[in-house]
């Protein structure tokens, strides 16, 4: 049973009438451009064919009822006429409440809604299940009430909800790609202007995501430390963000910087340049160059930004040994565990899967999870 059929059936059973709309918003994987988003830089993600799906209908009052199919059909209910506050027990409900609350601040011309939510974006894998949920809820209200909001505004609203209501720091990339993703394309995003450019993906290439299943423990504290180090670097150059520093300017004075800060800055500057070049390589179908850029990105994250772990490095090495210069592989996401992403000719996927199955657990004691994805369409009706 598809997520659409599942949520429609649950909706009819729970609320006693049929849903009028079904909306989806996808998760994402970032192909290249790591930790560049909060430095006003470039990222190159694609939406994937794992998504949050919501069957829904407008109400003629100001009540919101939400059922979470993936959390034992827990039900949350709140009113648009009262101040929206955090739910005491259901963390999932706070993503919904946050999106609705921040949408009220942008455009208060919507009424109540009934929703049933389900999704298959793996949670805790760094594939943006939370952004997918935020964008899906925003799109529900936009579609049901014909709100004059575009995808970028729905994305910004989701980011605000996560930062201010849920209380989790995040850049804008995850929500933007979920809202604006394009089938068979990646999206080059300028995180300063929020300008986007669709980049066609070569035919016959699979997007493979492998979860190391190494439990991320340092990610929060270390993430904040990296942000502070980048801000220190930008201040040294008297610029608003590292986006505004050239590699030549950096090389001329790198010896004057704190050595750790210098390494962090070098990663951001080189990663930004790699990301822009990667978009061109992809568009030209140059998988060999894309693979080189992904390898350089991984080495930079490992040696300069220091956010990889041995388990992730092992996974990357296993995959690279199989694909050689026919594709690319690197860690993706915040670091300290999580996933790797690989661009692999479809005919090599079975060999990669076999090599990883034979070697990764033997070397690390952890079993991986393997996902083969397609670059998919952003949020909308399904």
UniProtKB/Swiss-Prot annotation:
Compartments where found: Cytoplasm
UniProt cross-references to InterPro entries, sorted A to Z: Galactokinase (IPR000705), Galactokinase_bac (IPR022963), Galactokinase_CS (IPR019741), GalKase_N (IPR019539), GHMP_kinase_C_dom (IPR013750), GHMP_kinase_C_sf (IPR036554), GHMP_kinase_N_dom (IPR006204), GHMP_knse_ATP-bd_CS (IPR006203)
Disulphide bonds in the chain: none
Catalytic reaction(s) noted: alpha-D-galactose + ATP = alpha-D-galactose 1-phosphate + ADP + H(+)
Gene3D superfamilies (alphabetical): 3.30.230.10, GHMP kinase, C-terminal domain
Superkingdom, taxonomy of origin: Bacteria
UniProtKB keywords: ATP-binding, Carbohydrate metabolism, Cytoplasm, Galactose metabolism, Kinase, Magnesium, Metal-binding, Nucleotide-binding, Transferase
EC annotation from Swiss-Prot or TrEMBL: 2.7.1.6
Name of a matching Pfam family: GHMP_kinases_N
Chain positions recorded as Mg(2+) binding sites: 130, 162
Binding-site residues, substrate: 34-37, 223
Enzyme class: transferase
Active site residues according to the UniProt entry: 174
GO cellular component: cytosol
Pathway annotation from the record: Carbohydrate metabolism; galactose metabolism
HAMAP family: Galactokinase
Family from the record: Belongs to the GHMP kinase family. GalK subfamily.
Purpose: Catalyzes the transfer of the gamma-phosphate of ATP to D-galactose to form alpha-D-galactose-1-phosphate (Gal-1-P).
The protein, known as: Galactokinase
Lineage: Bacteria, Pseudomonadati, Pseudomonadota, Gammaproteobacteria, Enterobacterales
Gene that specifies this protein: galK
